[in-house]
């Protein structure tokens, strides 16, 4: 799990 991937996903969700 990559931190950048999580951040990008969070931006899409929010």
UniProtKB/Swiss-Prot annotation:
Q: What is this protein called?
A: Mastoparan-S
- UniProt keywords, alphabetically: Amidation, Antibiotic, Antimicrobial, Fungicide, Immunity, Innate immunity, Membrane, Secreted, Target cell membrane, Target membrane
Does Membrane count among this protein's keywords?
yes
State the remark under miscellaneous: Is the only mastoparan described so far that does not belong to the order of Hymenoptera.
One BP term from GO? defense response to fungus
Is Membrane found in the keyword set? yes
| Native source organism of the sequence | Sphodromantis viridis
Q: Which GO terms describe its cellular component?
A: extracellular region; membrane; other organism cell membrane
Principal cellular location given in the protein's record: secreted
Q: Which family, according to UniProt? A: Belongs to the MCD family. Mastoparan subfamily.
Name positions with the PTM Leucine amide. 14
Tissue distribution is: May be secreted in hemolymph.
State its location(s): Secreted; Target cell membrane
UniProt function note: Antimicrobial peptide with a broad antimicrobial activity against Gram-negative and Gram-positive bacteria, as well as against fungi (MIC=15.1-28.3 ug/ml for bacterial and 19.3-24.6 ug/ml for fungal pathogens). Shows low hemolytic activity against human erythrocytes. In vitro, shows significant cytotoxicity on HeLa cells.
